[in-house]
Each structure stands twice: as C-alpha cells, then as structure tokens.
Amino acid sequence: HSTHKLLNALSQASYIHVREGRGAINFSRFNQAYMMHATTSPLYAICASNDVAVSMMDGNSGLSLTQEVIDEAVDFRQAMARLYKEFTADGSWFFKPWNKEVVTDPQTGKTYDFADAPTKLLTTVQDCWVMHPGESWHGFKDIPDNWSMLDPIKVSILAPGMGEDGELEETGVPAALVTAWLGRHGIVPTRTTDFQIMFLFSMGVTRGKWGTLVNTLCSFKRHYDANTPLAQVMPEL
C-alpha cells in the first residue's frame, strides 16, 4: 500500500505486504521476482522514509496517531452534518457528508442523529459505518448484510443534484465546479465524480486544515446563492 498517502513517508513510497496464510509464499522466489522489476539505483531517501514510518507506527504511538486521524475525520463529518441540518432546516442547501444519518449505540439502544452522536461511539463502534441492506443512504439496494463498510477517514461529501436513488434532480451543483473553486484556494480533493467529492484524511490533517475546507465550501455557497458571475469568482474558466 502507498505509505506516502496514509503514513509519513516520502512521495512514491509504498510497501508490499506478504501474508503468511494457508498458501505461504516462498520468500526467496518472491524476492527474485520483485528484483526483476526493481531498480538497482533506488532513491535511498524514499527507502529510509519507509523505515521512519515503521518506527512511528510501532507500539502505542502508532495507535495514537491512527486514532487522531479517525477523530479528525469524524469531527469534520459531524461539522458538515450540522451545517447541512442548519441550512436545510431554513429551506436552503449545503453539502452533505456521505454516511449514515442515524446511528445506534449497541450498548444502550439509544439512537442519535449522526451530527449529534458521541464522538467515542462513532470512532469505536464499527456498526456506525457498515452498509446494511434496506438503508437508503448508500444507494445499494441488494447489498449483502455486513459485506461492506465505509472507511471513516475517506470522507465523501455530496453536492445537491442527485437523489439517494441515483436519479438526477431538477437542479444541482456540479462537483467539478466545486473542485475548481477548491483548487483556486489550494485544496485538492482525492476524487471528484458528478456530485460527489472525496477527501482523504491522513496524519497531519488537523482541525485548522479541515476548518479551512469548511470555510471554503461555505464561501462557494455564498457566491452560488448570490449568483456571482463566474468571471469574477473563477476567471480562468
């Protein structure tokens, strides 16, 4: 996997994981096959950064760093969910986080709106992220139960324009337009589709950084609602 995306390794750094399962791999044979495709003059700084990443993840420090990433991603999701509730309650629109709208505490049976759920519940209970059949939010009608779940740190937000059934609505905000606006402010999403924008939370993403993202999305909404001429907000288009 790409260690430069989620761990603190240099760009282009990655690991190959060899699992000692029922069909064990002959390491010598694997190594020879790997060397056929590897350079004999690697950039040793990249190799060293992988070693540093391993040391950082060793023991409790790795658990703490990973938990911080999950906590920040969940805080961002909840902030977006609260803004979505606030704007839609006034008959307006906003971007919606793609996750469950309601979660249940398995210990107490109490149900919470996602925006108001305890952080500990969302960061420790796996069922808060599982896609169950019959739920409309994920759009997969025939998905087997407990077959798939969201990764909390891969945060997708939905722009208005497509219903939960996958059908286009009468009006909407193209995600590509939002991505262009974010790019003008130095924010590069991980992926953009028709009405969905994904952001990958990793080590180093702090409340200050995702707070800037929230403010930039709010500024897009202000310009959109004011019908500001495109030539003023994005003249390069």
Language-model segments: what does each one mean?
Residues 1-33, 38-49:
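Active-site PLP attachment segment
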Residues 6, 22, 26-33, 52, ...:
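Alpha-helical context
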Residues 6, 22-24, 56, 161, ...:
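Short loop/turn segments at secondary-structure transitions that flank enzyme active sites
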Residues 51-59:
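Short glycine/serine- and small hydrophobic-enriched flexible loop segments
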Residues 60-237:
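Non-catalytic terminal extensions of PLP-dependent enzymes
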